């Protein structure tokens, strides 16, 4: 399911009475949610940090503290790595486990997530500000599908025999890398947790994972489910903490064999440097984006407007895939802007627990201030502010859906990743022009093109310098397809069969035999 597909019949959306009736059938948040898990998870045990320090976890819809969580630092990372290395040692329960049993454990974990789906969605809303229904239908559905997808792969990873010259028998093995350090962001806490651990565990690795300090609660809850599912101690270790301490310790740890990170390009560079300075651990990076969304005049205009709207504003604009550079062909530019503004003005901003809410708060005050500063830069540099542009006068970190027109390529809002509910609409005249401009970016995560001409669509898709290109759709992500960036949007791929390659080593084994026969 994509960001624009919280399925509800059209007649229900159009009829207020039918809408209210349908809301009675929708899933509900867990009332009076109890936060049970606030400690570090090592060796299937809940532990206090060695330092005894804790840090606050807040609700971005109110700005109020929800709880305190134990703060891991280097000493705790050392303990977790030791546990993970022991779990990965030759002869351990995990190393001797049948691949099919690893798959069964992942499937069991998916069952437990399905059982606790409403609780986990409530946690994502409380801690991350996501509208509950979006968390339930999009994030949690993605989590369950990812776990089941990799559960099915576990006993299907295999090598091959190779017909080499001479009297030799040669075959390959796909072996787990070892201990994998993983650092995940705050915009999709539970989904990114699953994107990281599922392929790693499928291949037989062990994991030390650090959730973002803003949103550790759902990852910690998953620790309880991982233990309940039956994963052996030390296979998954979850350590909440800060990037400069816990994150840096993971990136530079000599006992970690591979690191995977999702976050900013700036931090990604630091992680790659630390990996190189330590033990040349393997690195997968999924970093920032400033993605082009190209709308040709022959596209279905209403559909393109809605897809472009969802492509920017989904998840409060806090998406690395956000289609924030919308290039619109000149002949339909004014009409596209008009309809986009009308749609943005209809967007409902409110409590994440209100079922009619489309947009919740930004994650924290720092991000809120950054977005407003970039909006002001757009005004100062001459873009036309069509609507929005301000924070909403209420508790929490809410920002109005904002649309800019008359944006040029040299403006900060057209070059920098805003990570907020800000839509920039640029105009173009020719295909060659828009291809060149769309590719004129340090980033290359995703791109999209809307047109009814398949030849035009395929020509643009092949020209885009991006890891994913969507044609007549946006944010159509799934567990089966590889995802990753070109240029400064990262390296390596997550998801799909390609994601398994990032968590395994290929070993060649050659045996001398008396005589080879074909």
UniProtKB/Swiss-Prot annotation:
Keywords, ordered alphabetically: Cytoplasm, Lipid metabolism, NAD, Oxidoreductase, Phosphoprotein
A Gene Ontology MF term for this entry? 3-chloroallyl aldehyde dehydrogenase activity
State its location(s). Cytoplasm
Q: What is its main location?
A: cytoplasm
Q: What is this protein called?
A: Retinal dehydrogenase 2
UniProt tissue specificity:
Found in testis and less abundantly in lung, brain, heart, liver and kidney.
Membrane as a keyword?
no
Gene3D superfamilies per the UniProt record, alphabetical: Aldehyde Dehydrogenase, Chain A, domain 1, Aldehyde Dehydrogenase, Chain A, domain 2
Q: Where does NAD(+) bind?
A: 184-186, 210-213, 264-266, 366-370, 417
| Biological function | Catalyzes the NAD-dependent oxidation of aldehyde substrates, such as all-trans-retinal and all-trans-13,14-dihydroretinal, to their corresponding carboxylic acids, all-trans-retinoate and all-trans-13,14-dihydroretinoate, respectively. Retinoate signaling is critical for the transcriptional control of many genes, for instance it is crucial for initiation of meiosis in both male and female. Recognizes retinal as substrate, both in its free form and when bound to cellular retinol-binding protein. Lacks activity with benzaldehyde, acetaldehyde and octanal.
- Gene Ontology CC terms, in alphabetical order: cytoplasm; perinuclear region of cytoplasm
Give residue numbers for the modification (Phosphotyrosine).
Answer: 168
According to its UniProt record, the EC number is 1.2.1.36
What InterPro entries does the entry give?
Answer: Ald_DH/histidinol_DH, Ald_DH_C, Ald_DH_CS_CYS, Ald_DH_CS_GLU, Ald_DH_N, Aldehyde_DH_dom
């Amino acid at each position: 399911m994509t960001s624009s597909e919280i399925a509800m019949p059209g007649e229900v959306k159009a009829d207020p009475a039918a809408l209210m009736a349908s809301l009675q059938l929708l899933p509900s948040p867990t009332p009076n949610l109890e936060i049970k898990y606030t400690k570090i998870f090592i060796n299937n045990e809940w532990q206090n940090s060695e330092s005894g320090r804790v840090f606050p976890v807040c609700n971005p819809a109110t700005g109020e503290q929800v709880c305190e969580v134990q703060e891991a630092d280097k000493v705790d990372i050392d303990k977790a790595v030791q546990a993970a290395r022991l779990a990965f040692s030759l002869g351990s329960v995990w190393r001797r486990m049948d691949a099919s049993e690893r798959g069964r454990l992942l499937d069991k974990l998916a069952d437990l997530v399905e059982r606790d789906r409403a609780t986990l969605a409530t946690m994502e809303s409380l801690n991350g500000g996501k509208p509950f229904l979006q968390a339930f239908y999009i994030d949690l559905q993605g989590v369950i599908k990812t776990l089941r997808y990799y559960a099915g792969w576990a006993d299907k990873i295999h090598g091959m025999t190779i017909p080499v010259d001479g009297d030799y028998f040669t075959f390959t093995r796909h072996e787990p890398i070892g201990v994998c350090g993983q650092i995940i962001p705050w915009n999709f806490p539970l989904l990114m947790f699953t994107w990281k651990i599922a392929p790693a565990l499928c291949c037989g690795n062990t994991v030390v994972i650090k959730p973002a300090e803003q949103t550790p609660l759902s990852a910690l809850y998953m620790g309880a489910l991982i233990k309940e599912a039956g994963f052996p101690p030390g296979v998954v270790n979850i350590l909440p903490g800060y990037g400069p301490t816990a994150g840096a310790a993971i990136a530079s740890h000599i006992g970690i064999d591979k690191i995977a990170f999702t976050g900013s390009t700036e931090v990604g560079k630091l992680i790659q440097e630390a990996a190189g300075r330590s033990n040349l651990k393997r690195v997968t990076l999924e970093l920032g984006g400033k993605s082009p969304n190209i709308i040709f005049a022959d596209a279905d205009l209403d559909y393109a407007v809605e897809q472009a709207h969802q492509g920017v504003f989904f998840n409060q604009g806090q998406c690395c895939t956000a289609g924030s550079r919308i290039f619109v062909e000149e002949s339909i530019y004014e009409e596209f802007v008009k309809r986009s503004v009308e749609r943005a003005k209809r967007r409902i901003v409110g409590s994440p627990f209100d079922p009619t809410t489309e947009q919740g708060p930004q994650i924290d005050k720092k991000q809120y201030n950054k977005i407003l500063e970039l909006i002001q830069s757009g005004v100062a540099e001459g873009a036309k502010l069509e609507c929005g542009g301000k924070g909403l006068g209420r508790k929490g970190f809410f920002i109005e859906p904002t649309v800019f027109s008359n944006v040029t390529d040299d403006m900060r809002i057209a070059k920098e990743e805003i990570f907020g509910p800000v839509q920039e609409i640029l105009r173009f005249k020719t295909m060659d022009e828009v291809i060149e401009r769309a590719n004129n970016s340090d980033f290359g995560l995703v791109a999209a093109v809307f047109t009814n001409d398949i030849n035009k669509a395929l020509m643009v898709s092949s020209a885009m310098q991006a890891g994913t290109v969507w044609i007549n759709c946006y944010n159509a992500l799934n567990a089966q397809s590889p995802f990753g960036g070109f240029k400064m949007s990262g390296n390596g791929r997550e998801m799909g069969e390609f994601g398994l390659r990032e968590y395994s080593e290929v070993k060649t084994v050659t045996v001398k035999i008396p005589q080879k026969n074909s």
